[in-house]
UniProtKB/Swiss-Prot annotation:
The gene is atpH. It is a peripheral membrane protein. This is ATP synthase subunit delta. One of its GO terms (molecular function) is proton-transporting ATP synthase activity, rotational mechanism. NCBIfam families: ATP_synt_delta, PRK05758.2-2. It comes from Albidiferax ferrireducens (strain ATCC BAA-621 / DSM 15236 / T118) (Rhodoferax ferrireducens). GO terms for cellular component: plasma membrane; proton-transporting ATP synthase complex.
Length: 176
């Protein structure tokens, strides 16, 4: 079977080209469809041979917050009819990468042991943008196992200033 990234690439490229006039608008509904498509029960329903593509489409359209734009409807129908619903999260990820490349920004995930308030997050985002020398779309995910501090992932770069990482470094130094 082909890799999911290989399957998703033509869909992401076509979606990107078709939505160049409104990338931000498309990003909103692509993200929503991605979230919906990650549901294992939905994927199981869609894989049922007794369920039609129209039924899957109606279910997803019904779950979506508000009405989907015409482009989103056409895109979703195409993905479902081609049996690629399970590839939708990867399509969305590749679309996001293309959108970020177009705008000169990157996604940054900040893993934190504790919740970060909006003021601190804004300051952190500004600092990270200087550190990584580009505009960042920052999101936060809680990871209590970090004990304290943060771990930032921007593309393939990782900045880890968590207590857990420091303890691991100390452990390595002591056992070396």
């Amino acid at each position: 079977m082909a890799e999911l990234a290989t399957i998703a690439r033509p869909y992401a490229e076509a979606l990107f080209k078709a939505s160049l006039s409104d990338l931000n608008g498309a990003a909103v509904w692509v993200e929503e469809l991605e979230t919906i498509a990650k549901n294992p029960q939905l994927l199981q329903f869609a894989d049922n041979p007794n369920v039609t593509a129209a039924q899957v489409y109606e279910l997803i359209a019904g779950i979506a917050q508000g009405a989907l734009p015409a482009m989103a409807q056409n895109f979703l129908r195409t993905v479902i009819e081609n049996g690629r619903l399970s590839a939708l999260p990867e399509i969305a990820a590749q679309f996001r990468v293309m959108k970020n490349a177009q705008s000169g920004s990157s996604d940054a995930v900040v893993y934190s042991a504790f919740a970060i308030d909006s003021t601190a997050l804004a300051e952190l985002a500004a600092t990270l943008e200087q550190r990584f020398a580009r505009k960042l779309n920052v999101s936060v995910q809680l990871q209590p196992e970090l004990i304290g501090g943060i771990r930032v992932v921007v593309g393939d770069e990782v900045l880890d200033s968590s207590v857990k990482a420091r303890l691991e470094q100390m452990k390595m130094a002591l056992t070396a």
